């Protein structure tokens, strides 16, 4: 991948501008091609710079009545050679730019999927998407119309300037004075582009977030008759992006005309003064024509350099946003070293999961768990119940190491989960979220997320385990039937059971279920309960439950309130001894 591999994380603060040096790691993989492009650029520049001298020779020989056929043939050959070199160079440059964008997108997407969960909590999805999409696209212009146009233009300017000095130092001085003043003024404006371009990309990210939010909640918006309000919200974000883009365009619009006026003014000066010098016999007509040709070879690259500079600044602004994400340490970057004895999870006949005086607070927030201690014996079913905000789902997240405990320890088979490699830990855990995501695509694709090499028979078996075998039978497409965006073609109960099937496919001995029956009707809830009963025989289950009816037969129930354990026992024991549990059960008509 054409992306940095050894850049230290956290090395690109958001507000610190980055320079061209930041591009080098991205271009390292394409170094060979870029060397070829550079060589072709030099050859093309040489072919172009030779043309005015040949033109002067043709004109001088015509004035002297001499033959010019051979010189004209060489001139035509140089023009054709320059065109061929330019075409090949541009193709290689575009291919390199596309490779750079591809490599950056792969790197960025892979890094996004490995960010700590806390980063997803605090960042907007749409903004992250815009960094993968629009920001990486701007890098293409950095390589093509930015970096290499600047280099090629500089070569042409140097060559043309040298030739102009040799032809007529006086005319070159006149040219330099006019062009230099104009370019200095234009460069002053061009320096503002990077900050403006970064601000424009930020506004695009906000607009993408607004669109993503509206589309993901399309049914709610439609049912609430809020289309007009949401449209205005998106339109407001779009107007801000439009305004930010206009600010960039205004600066670029100033730079372009300044370059044009500079070239035209220099051309008129050279014609006037040069014509007078031809009349005075100081130079020949051929010298003047060659000088004018070099003037355009000087002016056009200068204009390209100015345009390339603005493109480069826009691209560096986008690169800064990309680097900002890549500088965020991936999950596990700050893990404590894993002991050699902890590379495999031990399997001892002690409590499968143990919470030992666990304390936890979300980053930047207050503590949500306090001195939580209880054990989940191997092969049993334990339920976590309590009011909203009691910390039930947080406990599951700590087992999965989505977050790390602030105090105490979570242990699996006696080992602190922080001492275990995350992949090895999660291979032993099946996790089903409260809002179980079903990905757009087919039934098969959703199942294979956890175990991509699972056989057809294994897929059908796991569907049967959760009473979903009918999904593969009700369509001629079988397991390749489409489930729709977010599983919209499935019922709520089918989505939840599909998530459980996905978790079961890898055969984990521990299953973590976060309110699996939330928002289900009684029929789907009963089907899901049967599925849970079927898979509980061979596993340890830790279930967060809002509906107590789904866990009344659990081996133990842990009651949480305010981030603390207030009671542990069976349904019968807690109904008799714990006021909070009895209140919850009474509200759900489980006790009189």
Question: Where in this protein do the model-derived segments appear?
Answer:
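Alpha-helical segments in transporter systems
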Residues: 21, 32-53, 57, 75, ...
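Transmembrane helices of ABC transporter permease
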Residues: 29, 33-43, 145-199, 270-284
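Helix-loop-helix
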Residues: 64-65, 163-177, 251-320, 325-329
